Amino acid sequence: MHKIFSKNNLIFFVFVAFIFVVIVLQFFVSSENATKVNLSQTFEPISWLHLLGTDDYGRDLFTRIIIGARSTLFVTVLTLIAIVVIGVTLGLFAGYKKGWIERLVLRFIDVGLSIPEFIIMIALASFFQPSLWNLVISITLIKWMNYTRLTRSIVNSEMNKPYIKMAQLFHVPTRTILIRHLTPKIIPAIIVLMVVDFGKIILYISSLSFIGLGAQPPTPEWGAMLQQGRDFISSHPIMLIAPASVIAITILIFNLTGDALRDRLLKQRGEYDESH
């Protein structure tokens, strides 16, 4: 058991340290250097002045990655907020109200989840004009279904418990039951899913930008930087390796953090298996 806590604490420390470093670095770089073209400094090698060198327009790669983190992480957070608001709200009503509302939502989710979500995202993103804001819409229209299904499942398991029956018996308003009694039961599982999905959404945003459906030049964004670096993989591989490494490390950190949170949640519920 001690090993489990040690692992979780280490992962949490790495997670917090990563976020802290990203935030602090924002104050030491200029967004102007991320987009300003300087053709006299194209393909500069790695140095103290340019920690990762420069690209084909003379822009500092390190600065672009740090500023790109602002774009990627902000859009990811915004997308998650939209997903949670829509998904949890529908899940609460579907699980509590039952009847035709639940059946309609479940049938829609069954159809939506039967198709690979990334394919649908590509179709939706292609329908809109390429931009980061339209990626928020495209991803939200797909990812809310997982949160609705999870929320409904938890609500269903709580509906037959005495505290809900007593609240209904004393005619406690539905809004009060949903917000004060059921929502706290949902929050831990939703937080775990959010942390795990954070990495997935970063991957979706980067992938869609890589194929030209997200951020457009000269906006510094990790996926768009991958697309740009692809053309120089032989002559200047750092242009591809740097953003790819940042994406991979970020996704790994959030996935490990999500796993650690899930383990702790299961332990608190008394469901954790010591042999895990």
UniProtKB/Swiss-Prot annotation:
Induction per the UniProt record: Transcription is stable during the exponential phase and increases only in standard conditions in late exponential phase.
Chief location: membrane
Residues passing through the membrane, by range: 10-30, 73-93, 108-128, 186-206, 238-258
Consequence of gene loss (knockout): Deletion of the nikBCDE operon strongly reduces nickel transport and urease activity. Mutant shows decreased virulence in a mouse model of ascending UTI. Insertion mutant shows attenuated growth in several infection models.
Xref: InterPro entries: ABC_transport_permease, BP-dependent_transpt_permease, MetI-like, MetI-like_sf
Family according to the record: Belongs to the binding-protein-dependent transport system permease family. OppBC subfamily.
Record-given protein name: Nickel import system permease protein NikC
Native species: Staphylococcus aureus (strain NCTC 8325 / PS 47)
